[in-house]
């Protein structure tokens, strides 16, 4: 008999004489002559109650059906007299698929700390909180693909292994097939001729540069994949491996870039509100009681916008004491970003036209010679959600910027070729997917919105 998911069983419009369900037992309560099982299969937040009568043969082994055990049941789907549940199952057959030792099973019927659950990341998807987080993660990923497909973008795949440093920061993971004792070092002159590729190879920090090449042939593209940063930052906002959404659009300027970033954010938020109501309600009750209200505001209201210069003036006039200094030419820190989004504007804000010294070489130099056509989307409780820019399309200006940043022109010969052959204005941005999920769930630690977090000193699973 075909299995029915619990989410579909609970949505039934009429009783069913026989139904088959599989899942994991959340709780078992024994009464005289029968037992109540709460079963969840991960398809939704809600459990379904199964009533096992002592008259069925499998009842003799009901003691082995403990919390965490996997079961396969068939029975009659009937209206439930219990409060808060529409349907329940009167079990006819029960098969224990996999037992779970009640003494050693880590997930008991109590609220576990996030720190503890990170140590058993292979099991935490069975909890209410993390099951909800990962369902929202799945729905958000689908909504992103849906958003770009509806707008005529092509989904492209950019390399994980790269010989380029998009950010110019050098905080990259090196990939080598050489033994440790044979690895290139400064003392050996960084000779890579014996390595697999014959040159230095790293894990990508961004697919942007490669996506630009595809946009300048396909028009509108986006990437959605893992990126890697070897930053030794043990903060709630940083991870060594995370996912990025990076659109690139030919013939677009900074204004179009900002419009796309806002449209994408608001559309995804709107779809999560529509499609994940039960899971969002869990986070709204137990993680952040203002979550749904804030998400509705993001979905309904246009974002604020201000230049970097205006942002600095607002921070200086705020009267607040910040830990980090505020001055033109200094990058905005998280505390500054959150003040602007949470306290001054009270909603997301797009800050644009940053000083060229604090932004990457590929961002278009503005006519003032001091700023670049860059933008960041700042949101409450998170800070920076998106960073983007109009890209520098002028060959001479780009070469000068690469030299200013101390980068090697030869490493970017192919990127410069785009400016030699039919160069056009173009723009794009990067959104950290995990930061979007923190916004959508109210979860404050990036380790809790990715199934297997990779952070300094942590490579379990």
Swiss-Prot record:
It is an enzyme of class 6 (ligase). GO terms for biological process: asparaginyl-tRNA aminoacylation. GO terms for molecular function: asparagine-tRNA ligase activity; ATP binding; nucleic acid binding. GO terms for cellular component: cytoplasm. It is found in: Cytoplasm. The keyword Nucleotide-binding applies. InterPro entries: Aa-tRNA-synt_II (IPR004364), aa-tRNA-synth_II (IPR006195), aa-tRNA-synth_II/BPL/LPL (IPR045864), Asn-tRNA-ligase (IPR004522), Asp/Asn-tRNA-synth_IIb (IPR002312), NA-bd_OB-fold (IPR012340), NA-bd_OB_tRNA (IPR004365). PANTHER family: ASPARAGINE--TRNA LIGASE, MITOCHONDRIAL-RELATED, ASPARTYL/LYSYL-TRNA SYNTHETASE. HAMAP family: Asn_tRNA_synth. This is Asparagine--tRNA ligase. It comes from Nitratidesulfovibrio vulgaris (strain DP4). The lineage of its organism: Bacteria, Pseudomonadati, Thermodesulfobacteriota, Desulfovibrionia, Desulfovibrionales.
């Amino acid at each position: 008999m075909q299995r029915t998911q619990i989410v579909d069983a609970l949505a039934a419009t009429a009783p069913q004489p026989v139904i088959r369900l599989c899942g994991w037992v959340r709780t078992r309560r024994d009464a005289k002559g029968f037992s109540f099982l709460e079963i969840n299969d991960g398809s939704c937040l809600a459990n379904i109650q199964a009533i096992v009568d002592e008259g069925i043969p499998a009842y003799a082994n009901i003691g082995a059906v403990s919390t965490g055990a996997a079961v396969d049941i068939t029975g009659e789907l009937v209206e439930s007299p219990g409060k808060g549940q529409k349907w329940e199952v009167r079990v006819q057959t029960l098969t224990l698929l996999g037992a779970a030792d009640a003494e050693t099973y880590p997930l008991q019927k109590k609220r576990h700390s996030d720190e503890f659950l990170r140590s058993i990341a292979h099991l935490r998807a069975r909890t209410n909180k993390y099951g909800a987080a990962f369902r929202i993660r799945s729905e958000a990923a689908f909504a992103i693909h849906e958003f770009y497909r509806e707008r005529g973008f092509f989904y492209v795949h950019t390399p994980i292994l790269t010989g380029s440093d998009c950010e110019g920061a050098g905080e990259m993971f090196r990939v080598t097939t050489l033994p440790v004792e044979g690895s290139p070092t400064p003392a050996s002159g960084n000779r890579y001729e014996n390595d697999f590729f014959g040159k230095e190879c790293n894990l990508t920090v961004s697919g942007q540069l490669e996506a630009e090449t595809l946009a300048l042939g396909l028009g509108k593209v986006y990437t959605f994949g893992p990126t890697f940063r070897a930053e030794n930052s043990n903060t709630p906002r940083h991870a060594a491996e995370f996912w990025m959404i990076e659109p690139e659009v030919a013939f677009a300027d900074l204004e179009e870039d900002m419009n796309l970033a806002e449209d994408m954010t608001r559309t995804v938020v709107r779809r999560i509100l529509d499609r994940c109501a039960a899971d969002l309600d869990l986070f709204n009750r137990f993680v952040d009681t203002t979550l749904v209200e804030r998400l509705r505001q993001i979905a309904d209201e246009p974002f604020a916008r201000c230049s970097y210069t205006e942002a600095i003036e607002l921070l200086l006039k705020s009267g607040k004491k910040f830990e980090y200094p505020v001055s033109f030419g200094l990058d905005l820190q998280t505390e500054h970003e959150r003040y602007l989004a949470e306290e001054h504007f009270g909603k997301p804000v797009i800050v644009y036209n940053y000083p060229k010294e604090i932004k990457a070489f590929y961002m278009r130099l503005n006519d003032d010679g001091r700023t670049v056509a860059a933008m960041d989307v700042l949101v409450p409780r998170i800070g920076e959600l998106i960073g983007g820019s109009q890209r520098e399309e002028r060959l001479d200006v780009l070469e000068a910027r690469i030299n200013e940043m101390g980068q090697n022109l030869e490493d970017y010969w192919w990127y410069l070729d785009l400016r030699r052959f039919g160069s056009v204005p173009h723009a794009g941005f990067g959104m950290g997917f995990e930061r979007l999920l923190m916004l959508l769930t109210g979860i404050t630690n990036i380790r809790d919105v990715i199934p297997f977090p990779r952070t300094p000193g942590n490579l379990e699973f």
